[in-house]
Swiss-Prot record:
Residues 23-281 form the CoA carboxyltransferase N-terminal domain. A zinc finger (C4-type) spans 27-49. It holds the Pfam family Carboxyl_trans. This is Acetyl-coenzyme A carboxylase carboxyl transferase subunit beta. Its main location: cytoplasm. It catalyses: N(6)-carboxybiotinyl-L-lysyl-[protein] + acetyl-CoA = N(6)-biotinyl-L-lysyl-[protein] + malonyl-CoA. Its cofactor is Zn(2+). Acetyl-CoA carboxylase is a heterohexamer composed of biotin carboxyl carrier protein (AccB), biotin carboxylase (AccC) and two subunits each of ACCase subunit alpha (AccA) and ACCase subunit beta (AccD).
């Protein structure tokens, strides 16, 4: 026999409702829980701390081009396997599995269209495809984007989001650093602006090549930008690094970045800057 007897009925709760996956996202910076719709409306930036989430190229296209309308080109280029490279799996298998899993075909997408009524060519990298690494296809597509800009007599914007060179392609990957830099020189010869937008992360061979060669180097807030990662540097020199080292704000303070632009202001600032750069004196 129980010593205590409940006189009043217990609190009744309704059955728990299943919450669809992907409805909420946690901010990596401040930890705030954000509803997907709220995040989309805020261009995938945290309304509390302004942390910029990584976004895919097509979202940049939607943001930058008028009415989100653009024409993509060079979509069918695919990576080869010149070294017959194998780590935990064969390189072609890794590429195939990434395509199957992500629905993406490479770590960069090219498009052209109108930005505030003016022609613009955009080459946008995607960290979601093998860390946004630059292999022979990525280098070729960025080079072709420069060619298309010359053909259209239009500015070129390259959006960097990469961990660096694609080591599975060895020297073929490293060659793309020189290849892209050389092709961008042609833009300068034609007096066409090249704008580099660095997002989180812009590292390794990307920062050591085209990402730092812009007529204007722009960054999103708090983007990680550098060659080797901060942990590698710290372990090598055996010293603590300055606070904020390799973040966009640190680079702006030391003259490596020209401006930091919030994603909400990107299209307007870009259009105004390009209009000034194209004025004939």
């Amino acid at each position: 026999m129980a010593w205590f007897k409940r006189v009043t009925p217990s609190i009744r709760t309704t059955d728990k409702r299943d919450t669809p996956e992907g409805m909420w996202a946690k901010c990596d910076s401040c930890g705030a829980m954000l509803h997907k719709k709220q995040l989309e409306d805020n261009l995938f930036t945290c309304p509390q701390c302004a942390h910029h989430f990584r976004i895919a190229p097509y979202k940049y296209f939607s943001l930058l081009f008028d009415e989100g309308e653009c024409t993509e080109f060079d979509q069918n280029l695919r990576a080869a396997d010149p070294l017959s490279f194998t780590d935990t799996k064969h390189y072609p298998d890794r590429v195939h599995d990434t395509i199957e899993k992500s629905g993406k075909t490479e770590a960069v997408r090219n498009a052209y269209g109108k930005c505030e009524g003016a022609d613009l060519v955009v080459s946008a990298m995607d960290f979601g495809f093998i860390g946004g690494s630059m292999g022979s296809v990525v280098g070729e597509k960025i080079a072709r984007a420069a060619d298309r800009a010359i053909q259209l007599d239009a500015p070129l914007l390259v959006i960097s989001q990469s961990g660096g060179a694609r080591m599975m392609e060895g020297a073929f990957s490293l060659m793309q650093m020189a290849k892209t830099a050389a092709r961008l020189t042609r833009l300068g010869e034609k007096k066409l602006p090249f704008i580099s937008l660095m997002t989180d992360p812009t590292m390794g061979g990307i920062s050591a090549s085209f990402a730092m060669l812009g007529d204007l180097n722009i960054s999103e807030p708090k983007a990680l930008i550098g060659f080797a990662g901060p942990r590698v540097i710290r372990d090598t020199i055996k010293r603590d690094l300055p606070e904020g080292f390799q973040r966009a704000e640190f680079l702006l303070e030391h003259g490596f970045v020209d401006m930091i632009v919030h994603r909400k202001e990107l299209k307007q600032r870009l259009a105004k800057t390009l209009a000034m750069m194209r004025v004939e004196v």
